[in-house]
Amino acid sequence: DMAVLDYAAEQYPELPLHLSVQGSATNYETLKFYKNNFGIRRAVLPRVLSLKQVEAVAQYSPVELEVFAFGSLCIMAEGRCYLSSYLTDESPNTCGACSPAKDVRWEQTEIGLEARLNDVLIDRFEEGENAGYPTLCKGRFKVGDKTFHAIEEPTSLNTVELIPQLQAAGIKAVKIEGRQRSPAYVENVVRTWRRAIDLYNMNPEHFRVKKQWKEDLAKVSEGAQTTLGAYTRSW
């Protein structure tokens, strides 16, 4: 919310201001703009950047950087995607979520568990099938004579194995999705990540990702599968 950001910077100059990922700051020139005009101290980078791009931005960034570490994977350029607004009539930038809780509805039917967003069917799950949070980009749709995830399958971002590289790049904080998640989810993920970061800081040279960490995080992963997302892309 640019108006709130401007008001806070003008009226409370000592208030620590963090730029949301919805600010879509993908380069250091953008970060410099927000730093010079609003005095931000930290920014959350979008999930579309590769690790090399994160390192390049961090090298010249005038503010602290925070990156996504675990949670729902987004393949869109955050802050610039309005796909869900065609169903909800609200921008994710102003309501804070692609699928506002008030628009989400689950319905058990004779042919499966249906997920609806503002009453529009976006997926149907068979008994025993893992169900992801209903977002339009991860819905299953009929294209031609086939029904499948036309844009993206439900998958969770898990970068625990990148802790050494992220610290080396100078990243100050990792972001774990907690909004619209259960307390049990948050407790499990935060506990595992706390252990991993502490172990790395104790002995960086001998850091290895533990099998138990992967198993614990897999239990709460969307779609029961994880990925490093854009961090390891080559283009």
Give the location of each predicted region.
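Conserved N-terminal glycine/acidic-rich loop preference
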Residues: D1, E29-K32, I40-A43
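Active-site pocket-lining/capping segments in soluble small-molecule metabolic enzymes
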Residues: M2-A25, V44, V48-A173, R179-W235
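Non-catalytic positions within long, well-ordered alpha-helices that form the structural scaffold/packing
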Residues: K35-N36, Q167
